[in-house]
């Protein structure tokens, strides 16, 4: 790919500003954990795996800001850093997975000097980024076989390189199928209200030379009924133990329409997106965002002033609508409760 979503460079975190795409390809530099937290909250970086990487790098930056005389004081202050990052966005479990991993690494390496702990945390954050890229490539390899020759694939939101350390989950499957020589095309839902499909997915696929057609969200059923959609592939922000999946708002509607039209609906996600502590999707916390995201577009009002607004950022697709969950370890179908549990066994 010709862009980098996030990287550690010269003890700074560099991110592409996704709020300014597709008009401008601008990279932002962050040298402290609070600014990384604001970047996550403000969706300069978004997508569950990507914000997990960002949170890990934020912890590494925060460790460098801590002034402490003892390991105990260092770990207490690091907990505060982690709390700030954890409060940014509540739904994507990768955020919390990455933070907990960084906390464990810090605790396990407190036998050396504090400077050594800081270096270990930096190395771990970079390792999380590198692992995510490798996981996405593996997801792509496992999922590519599900995409038939000549397929038209519908995707919702952006689960591409911009949502990960690179390559993508849902778009990773599409990329891998394209790289295998399959003649495929993509229909991208625009994905209101943030327009991740229009601004980000369309931009990514066009840069890669993969044929893509943009549609508004309420057109998906029309094209499904006409037989123009072969399958659907989306990403995930959190997957409960029974396979219920939280993803960008509107995903549930796509899944229901796909089921009605006998179109397979696949979820692509790394195992770090699994939350087996939750029995089902009803327990997944759903982030509600500011009304202005709905009432304004590109800074201009598109609704009457003072109108009541609801703006959940995610919805939950019940497992019964999902034909398969594509992970870096393979494709899971059928009894998700048993198979997901087996998937993460050490």
Swiss-Prot record:
Any Gene Ontology biological process: L-methionine salvage from methylthioadenosine
Active site: 237
Pfam families, A to Z: IF-2B
Catalysed conversion reaction: 5-(methylsulfanyl)-alpha-D-ribose 1-phosphate = 5-(methylsulfanyl)-D-ribulose 1-phosphate
Pathway, per record: Amino-acid biosynthesis; L-methionine biosynthesis via salvage pathway; L-methionine from S-methyl-5-thio-alpha-D-ribose 1-phosphate: step 1/6
Gene Ontology terms for molecular function: S-methyl-5-thioribose-1-phosphate isomerase activity
InterPro entries noted in UniProt: IF-2B-related, IF-M1Pi, IF_2B-like_C, Initiation_fac_2B_a/b/d, M1Pi_N, NagB/RpiA_transferase-like
Gene that specifies this protein: mtnA
Alphabetical list of HAMAP family matching this protein: Salvage_MtnA
UniProt keyword list: Amino-acid biosynthesis, Isomerase, Methionine biosynthesis
Name of the protein in question: Methylthioribose-1-phosphate isomerase
Top enzyme class: isomerase
Residues marked Transition state stabilizer (site): 157
Sequence similarity: Belongs to the eIF-2B alpha/beta/delta subunits family. MtnA subfamily.
E.C. number: 5.3.1.23
Residue positions binding substrate: 46-48, 89, 196, 247-248
Protein function: Catalyzes the interconversion of methylthioribose-1-phosphate (MTR-1-P) into methylthioribulose-1-phosphate (MTRu-1-P).
